[in-house]
């Protein structure tokens, strides 16, 4: 009888990381569907919300671009977790994705120290979310490093 660890060979931290990126992607789609009010609520900025109100196409295109990036990042996390076939440049890709999330999250602290007047609630919560995403990725990457 196989040991409990042998039953599920997938890396759970990277599966969670993939789900987090997919949730981010879905929230970006919700912003497109929800329109200007959703752009404002999620902190996309008044310029983006106003452009969406005017019916301009670029807010949806930019948001769709972010959605596609987040879905690709979810796929890379699933690949590194062992749930999808090995994607091109998997090790470099998952390390870069992890670094982007961590750096995006950590940027909060120098901004708090150097320009606290520019820190908005959006910057705080989005930075903390990205830092959390990055830490989950890092946890998983460390666990699978030798197999990448």
What do these predicted regions represent?
Residues 93-109:
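Hydrophobic alpha-helical membrane segments
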């Amino acid at each position: 009888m196989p040991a409990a660890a042998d039953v599920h060979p997938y890396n759970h931290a990277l599966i969670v990381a993939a789900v987090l990126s997919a949730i981010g992607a879905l929230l970006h789609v919700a912003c497109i569907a929800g329109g200007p009010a959703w752009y404002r609520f999620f902190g996309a900025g008044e310029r983006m919300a106003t452009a969406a109100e005017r019916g301009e196409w670029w807010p949806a295109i930019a948001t769709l671009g972010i959605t596609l990036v987040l879905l690709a990042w979810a796929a890379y996390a699933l690949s590194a977790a062992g749930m999808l076939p090995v994607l091109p440049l998997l090790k470099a890709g998952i390390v870069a994705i992890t670094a982007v999330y961590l750096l995006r999250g950590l940027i909060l602290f120098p901004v708090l120290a150097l320009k606290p007047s520019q820190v908005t609630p959006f910057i705080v919560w989005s930075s903390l979310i990205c830092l959390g995403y990055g830490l989950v990725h890092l946890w998983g990457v460390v666990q699978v490093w030798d197999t990448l």
